[in-house]
Amino acid sequence: MQRSPLEKASIFSKLFFSWTRPILRKGYRQRLELSDIYHISSSDSADNLSEKLEREWDRELASKKNPKLINALRRCFFWRFMFYGIILYLGEVTKAVQPLLLGRIIASYDPDNKAERSIAIYLGVGLCLLFIVRTLLLHPAIFGPHHIGMQMRIAMFSLIYKKTLKLSSRVLDKISIGQLVSLLSNNLNKFDEGLALAHFVWIAPLQVTLLMGLLWELLQASAFCGLAFLVVLALFQAGLGKMMMKYRDQRAGKINERLVITSEMIENIQSVKAYCWEEAMEKMIENLRQTELKLTRKAAYVRYFNSSAFFFSGLFVVFLSVLPYALLKGIMLRKIFTTISFCIVLRMAVTRQFPWAVQTWYDSLGAINKIQDFLQKQEYKTLEYNLTTTEVVMENVTAFWEEGFGKLFEKAKQNNNSRKISNGDNSLFFSNFSLLGTPVLKDISFKIERGQLLAVAGSTGAGKTSLLMMIMGELEPSEGKIKHSGRISFCSQFSWIMPGTIKENIIFGVSYDEYRYRSVIKACQLEEDISKFAEKDNIVLGEGGITLSGGQRARISLARAVYKDADLYLLDSPFGYLDVLTEKEIFESCVCKLMANKTRILVTSKMEHLKKADKILILHEGSSYFYGTFSELQSQRPDFSSKLMGYDTFDQFTAERRNSIITETLRRFSLEGDASVSWNETKKQSFKQTGEFGEKRKNSILNSINSIRKFSIVQKTPLQMNGFEEDSGEPLERRLSLVPDSEHGEAILPRSNVINAGPTFQGRRRQSVLNLMTRSSVNQGQSIHRKTATSTRKMSLVPQANLTEIDIYSRRLSQDTGLEISEEINEEDLRECFFDDVESIPTVTTWNTYLRYVTVHKSLIFVLIWCLVVFLAEVAACLVVLCLLKKTSPQDKGNSTKGANNSYAVIITSTSAYYVFYIYVGVADGLLALGLFRGLPLVHTLITVSKILHRKMLHSVLQAPMSTLNTLKAGGILNRFSKDIAVLDDLLPLTIFDFIQLLLIVIGAVAVVSVLKPYIFLATVPVIVAFILLRAYFLHTSQQLKQLESEGRSPIFTHLITSLKGLWTLRAFGRQPYFETLFHKALNLHTANWFLYLSTLRWFQMRIEMIFVIFFIAVTFISILTTGEGEGTVGIILTLAMNIMSTLQWAVNSSIDVDSLMRSVSRVFKFIDMPAEGDQPNRSFKPSKDGQLSKVMIIENQHVKKDDIWPSGGQMTVKDLTAKYVDGGNAVLENISFSISPGQRVGLLGRTGSGKSTLLLAFLRLLNTEGEIQVDGVSWDSITLQQWRKAFGVIPQKVFIFSGTFRKNLDPYGQWNDQEIWKVAEEVGLRSVIEQFPGKLDFVLVDGGCVLSHGHKQLMCLARSVLGKAKILLLDEPSAHLDPITYQIIRRTLKQAFADCTVILSEHRIEAMLECQRFLVIEENKVRQYDSIQRLLSEKSLFRQAISPLDRLKLLPHRNSSKQRSRSKIAALKEETEEEVQETRL
């Protein structure tokens, strides 16, 4: 960045904004880079502004019971704000004085006032000086409030971010991500945009009072007729505005529906193509678009009438003000022109300035109140620690995630004690306790000495993560004691990577120690991964580490925790994404050796981890099921596997199903009907069994902490309701059985217990901030970020950036301390930061874009021609009247004086004929604005153009190859369908209409003035040329600055979301100050771009006005010096010239707006022009009897006989397959060759990132591939993509459930009847799940099927494949994150429904590979081995190294057969425990 010229600018340079000329010159000559932007001043830095406001806010909190944020803002910014308001008022006063001088000039040409003729030139000078003074006052008065608004936004941005880092986890659960982003973007932007208008709330009434006083002097009481009309008009416009808001609110819901489906489509575009759902998704979205456009047109029509009302109102205001006075007393022409000028100013004040100011204050105060309530939310409280403590002790700890429950717990306990209830009534307290909701942890006690390893195990939802949160202080205990030193390091279950280098992610602000760093890298198995990068550990990682595999992210997160020198290490399931071999090595070298003398708490379910732990804590339903050593566990709890795995009471509400992991913890006990408990003397807490998504969560972020909340309660078995019995009374074999019988399969499968009306798009619960932090690893690794080999895509809630400035800020981390960040930002870093965000769109919209836009719809050309014809007709009428006036003027010359002397009659001389002509021009202007036959067709047609462009872009994206889509960000694609389509629908049609309307008004007025005074035309030509050149000069720079500003806005929100994802990690490491500094850096960079844009815009606006002032001076003196007796001509000229001033400036601004909005059109065209996937010939489908497509596919191919059904057997032959993610990228698979027999099951083996999932994508032709694949003798080059992909059934890692009914999700094309769908649902074990929802198959799923578990979603994919009658099934780690019961259901379905199909399985679990006949081992992107299990186990191979001796025995055929012999119950229990727990990851 460069030093700002503003620092050394003179007072005149600041007044005229001349200091911006260097950047304007550079932007005109070349493309601007971030390095060209100027540094901000210290007064605009986020550090200073936030410190200033934070100091005043703290003062407000300390001094008052009811603190007001507006008081803190007032003390910071009020006096400067009022100073600019006074300047603005003085500028507006000059507008009221100008008509007085105009009236005196017109009066000086009256034949009866020849004495004043000599002072006309001085009056003209005075009028010109007023325009000059107004120009000098107005622009600083507008720029100042904009600047103050920017500073207020920066200060409140920082205050909100700091508060976010301090919020308690309970509060974070109540705030949705959308609400938080909206609080920062939508609300705070109001200060930037509207603060300049805020002063008109008091300026406009004063101005109206002054103007009415002057009009009273001219017209007396009749002046109030015009004012009354303006008030009525303002009320009419308010009514139109209310109607428009009604349509927009209705439309917003429809837009939300469309964008939900569109975002799901974009996020899962790979699955859409794999399922061949392009046409179905396109039809679904287009249907929603049709409904949306109906409301769009209504809103546009209302807004059009609202805009037109302003223009035609001028004529009626003048008529209503002048006509009563003229009829009663007669009127002089001087008064008419003066009244016209007054009414123009009065109309602006009443119908525009005052309503806008009121709206600005309403929005701003509403935003301030929202922020004020947010700043008073409950904060995270740091626990008190004893640094000398060497042990970790927890005594009888109970905790609730819901804040109010802890208080209720204490109150209920006190009530029981006061009543002195007997032992037989002790259940009373626990009955009330269950009504309050289940505590997440109950009566937990343990003690571990320094250097010991505590293994924490339990089923899903048992409270393992909550235990760690309580140790960290994120969860406050309701009762009990926690004791440790406070020096904690934490590794989250969900890998969190901050933008920056690998080294910075591991060091994370801790002092750098070379030996320790290298030891940690080695222990976490990162040496090999780092060596593959050219920059080694200095490679910059994007937000979320999207360029890394899940295993790499997990190891970096673990390395960060281990690198910190702490007393206590909390490791929350750190091995979830690691293959067996890597996990084993890291556990031995890192957890057991490197940290041997440290206290460790490890959340795990691996048997070998439990064996090596010093102490074991098994949690079940939040209670301590067991605490002790492993030997004690075997002897005391022989059934511990059922609690560890959750076989008996598996909680189906897994992480994917929960909208918030905290609120879901409460849904454990069932209440029949309503129940209530004592809250206090006046309040009752009601617990109603409502649907989880039955009621929309309020949009306001202000959910009171103590407010009454409704939540769903899940029904549980009697075993769970009655406590934690050691024996449920069931036979032991039944409780440990994993594989259900066919007839009982659905009964054993855990059911969903959410009973509610089908959720709608509007009714869905928003994702909470805490859910973002506790998102499952599936969602974290796959749902939002999809890894590619050489490119990245990401989905975000806000405007997108790639590696963002935060990457650069993180690089500034000092080796000694993370708080010292360099102020300088390297130009190379900036280019790297934004390399993917700089659009390849010209800085100024090309004429080709305009031409292409106009020709999208043929009707648009005819509408534009019609507009031109109407305008030419109006101009012709004006010129005819003008010619008649010139011909009649000499004949009426003798009557002029006579008519003028009659003061009681309306003048009817040739002079008044000019007045009649001017009225005609006014009528023409009104017709021009009102013209239904021109304006409405234009707006209607432009919306139709938007409809066509959306349809073409949607089709293009769906048909684009994945190699192209892999180079784009998902957020960028979504912005085209949201932001750019909104521009085409809302802003562009009316902006184009306004521009055409204003341009024609200016041309007509200039034509009239030029005909009256031809000399004025000579002055008009250079002015128009100057306007065109100045506009072109400014546009080159302004559009680039706007683009840079947009790019600079993304890192602010990216950093916010990144901080929220890793908030627990930040707090554990104490890195909040460092991240606050990074946030301020992001704010400062955005401020530099935004302030420069505001300054250059003001430079341009001031130059426009200066040019016009020169033009007006020329017009004034030409009129005064060349006009003879008769006041009509000079009155028309000067009045029109004053009107041209504002209209022409408005027209130029509209042209800039059109050019800016047309960039959205350019971006849409860029997407429309994307290449389509190759479509081969020779495709046909056999029609069924009812005319629909057949369920089987008929291939016309030289290798297959006519009418043969393909595929028939599922034989696959792969020859020399090479795959790339993007064109020109590195090969991710090389020379893969093998063959699969029909019906064979093949397992894919390899370490994380070896290319197993990539191979499955290559089979579906979702990558750039070379080589050949044949299925049943048919080559993939000889048939279409659709035909090829329909041969495969797919169960991906990331399951695609779009917002729609069960029926639509299973059969989007509507090819199958209900009977067939129910049959398949029963086969895969889904029928009982679907039947419990209202509407059954018509139940609407939202949020990716959040009411379903991950297992249910996998079954949905399985059902799709069964319906599609696929002969080849591709499974990409289907057992990842599944509960054991659902996994066994999937295994059973695979055996039955796909018994004669070819199955290709990618898995980490050894158990999942039991039924594979052959194994394909992939290493370093190549096939290393392809053989049977016996051969692989008999030689040295990656597969042999990856499994334990016990697993090898399990995989051998004789071992499998020997397992069938009868065993005693205890022996069976012990062996099954070791086998199942060994490979289960929770």
UniProtKB/Swiss-Prot annotation:
GO cellular component: apical plasma membrane; chloride channel complex; cytosol; early endosome; early endosome membrane; endoplasmic reticulum membrane; membrane; nucleus
InterPro entries reported for this sequence: AAA+_ATPase, ABC1_TM_dom, ABC1_TM_sf, ABC_transporter-like_ATP-bd, ABC_transporter-like_CS, ABC_transporter_C-like, CFTR/ABCC7, CFTR1_ATP-bd_dom1
Lipidation feature positions (S-palmitoyl cysteine): C524, C1397
Residues that, per the record, bind ATP 1: W401, S434, G458, S459, T460, G461, A462, G463, K464, T465, Q493
Compartments, as annotated in UniProt: Apical cell membrane; Early endosome membrane; Cell membrane; Recycling endosome membrane
Region Disordered, residue ranges: 1454-1482
Modifications after synthesis and translation: N-glycosylated.
Ranges annotated as spanning the membrane: 78-98, 123-146, 196-216, 223-243, 299-319, 340-358, 860-880, 920-940, 992-1012, 1015-1035, 1097-1117, 1132-1152
Tagged with keyword Chaperone: no
Keywords assigned: ATP-binding, Cell membrane, Chloride, Chloride channel, Endoplasmic reticulum, Endosome, Glycoprotein, Ion channel, Ion transport, Isomerase, Isopeptide bond, Lipoprotein, Membrane, Nucleotide-binding, Nucleus, Palmitate, Phosphoprotein, Repeat, Transmembrane, Transmembrane helix, Transport, Ubl conjugation
Motif PDZ-binding: positions: 1480-1482
Segments in the Cytoplasmic topological domain: 1-77, 147-195, 244-298, 359-859, 941-991, 1036-1096, 1153-1482
All copies of domain ABC transmembrane type-1, residue ranges: 81-365, 860-1156
Coiled coil: none
Superkingdom: Eukaryota
Residue sites binding ATP 2 per the record: Y1221, G1246, R1247, T1248, G1249, S1250, G1251, K1252, S1253
Region entry Interaction with GORASP2, spans: 1388-1482
UniProt xrefs under PANTHER family: ATP-BINDING CASSETTE SUB-FAMILY C (PTHR24223), CYSTIC FIBROSIS TRANSMEMBRANE CONDUCTANCE REGULATOR (PTHR24223:SF19)
Family: Belongs to the ABC transporter superfamily. ABCC family. CFTR transporter (TC 3.A.1.202) subfamily.
Name of the featured protein: Cystic fibrosis transmembrane conductance regulator
Species this chain originates from: Sus scrofa (Pig)
Lineage, highest ranks first: Eukaryota, Metazoa, Chordata, Craniata, Vertebrata
Name of the coding gene: CFTR
